[in-house]
Amino acid sequence: MSALVNEMPTVNLMQAKNRILANPDIIYFLRGEPGVGKSSLALELQRATGYPLSMMDVPNLDLGDIAMPIIDHENKVTRYYPNARFGIHTGEPVVICLDEFTKGADPVKNMLHPMFEVFMPRLGDLHIHEDSITYLTGNLDTDGVGDGLAQHTRQRIIELIVRKPNSDEWLAWALNNGISPILMAWVDRYPQCLESYLDG
């Protein structure tokens, strides 16, 4: 048995993107320090797939923001309709980023949980298109910003630790994202500005 059972792989943003694109049916949980690009990776995934993007700020969601019960008088049942912001009502693939999932309220996280099922993931009563990409973001425990994840969630996802970009990686990203040339030159001159407390 491996001695590294409890260690998570550490990747850069490009590696995380490539893993997600190569395995769209797996729910990845990207953890890293604040500001490393976990959330903005959603735009890269949207560009790569051409799918619509649904950015969900989980800490600001309440139960009524996820789905609502609707009465079906004809069949004498209730149906659960998800919020249109998730984009799954179109029946087309979508990129869904459950941003800061680990800071959401427990009832909200539990309500989002059916999205992580291996067979027929859904939200409310609607199934998510099989080509859709869903991923979660959160911070490291050492950041001390209130992240928590239940064990039954951990069993359904793959955790990746996303490290901060180095200056070469950041400059390649900045070049394609409209960042000021002055700021790019400064980062090129002072690459230590991207150093992390984890580096020491």
Task: Please provide the spans of the model-predicted regions.
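C-terminal regulatory/interaction module of P-loop NTP-utilizing enzymes
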Residues: 1-200
